[in-house]
A protein has these predicted regions:
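Terminal amphipathic helices with adjacent charged low-complexity linkers/tails
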Residues: 182-209
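Glycine-rich ThDP/TPP pyrophosphate-binding loop and its adjacent helix/strand module
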Residues: 1-188
Length: 213
């Protein structure tokens, strides 16, 4: 404990902010002045539905401006930052943490410009409902790509070094997937083997006429 100066961290996607539970939580935290930081990750889409069909003004931080604390009353601090702006993300999260921890004020960070590498499920490819321009924008503003550019621009590493790290990460991911899948299958395979053994025993007894009446 830090003498009660802890921070509760929450995270939610932009589409889920259209649900009633989100608004109930936001209101209650504002009333109680809960020292929390909630991040809203906004890619402007829900499950195949654009923000224009689910969020007033297509902007959750815009419609929550009335919750911003001011000289007239307590409320929230609301910060807006772009997902691909790494330095600004660090500044924003540090600032939000400081406010919540030291002043016991709830904070919302609206992270805009998120990208969606894949659809919301294996059956829902986002190529079906996004324009070619939007898909290209997402490729150009992918957070990993932008972070890599930031690293190269500051001379922290070369592009060749980053490419090597990427290849190593992909290899480790594939190998890890195989290991995890084998572990996951080990018990079912064992149980199946035991069940087959029992069934074969029953079959053999039946062939010997043990179960005949």
């Amino acid at each position: 404990s830090n003498n009660g100066n802890e921070v509760a961290w929450g995270t939610i996607g932009n589409a889920s902010t259209s649900e009633g539970l989100f608004f109930e939580t936001i209101n209650a935290a504002g009333v109680l002045q809960v020292p929390m930081v909630i991040s809203v990750w906004d890619d402007e889409y829900g499950i195949s539905v654009g923000a224009e069909y689910q969020t007033t003004k297509e902007d959750i931080s815009a419609i929550l401006k009335g919750f911003q604390r001011d000289e007239y009353g307590k409320g929230y601090d609301i910060f807006v930052v772009e997902a691909w702006d790494y330095p600004e993300l660090i500044k924003t999260f540090l600032r939000a943490s400081k406010v919540a921890r030291e002043e016991h004020v709830p904070v919302m960070i609206h992270v805009k410009g998120m990208t969606q590498p894949q659809g919301h499920s294996t059956s829902g490819s986002h190529e079906r409902y996004k324009s070619p321009e939007r898909l290209q924008w997402e490729k150009d503003h992918d957070c990993i790509l932008k972070f890599g550019q930031w690293i190269v621009d500051r001379g922290i590493a070369t592009q060749e070094e980053l490419d090597a790290v990427t290849q190593e990460a992909k290899k480790a991911s594939r190998e890890g997937k195989k290991v995890a899948w084998n572990i996951f299958q080990s018990l079912p395979k064992q149980l199946r083997s035991e069940a087959l053994s029992l069934l074969k025993g029953i079959q053999q007894k039946g062939e010997k006429g043990i179960f005949t009446t």
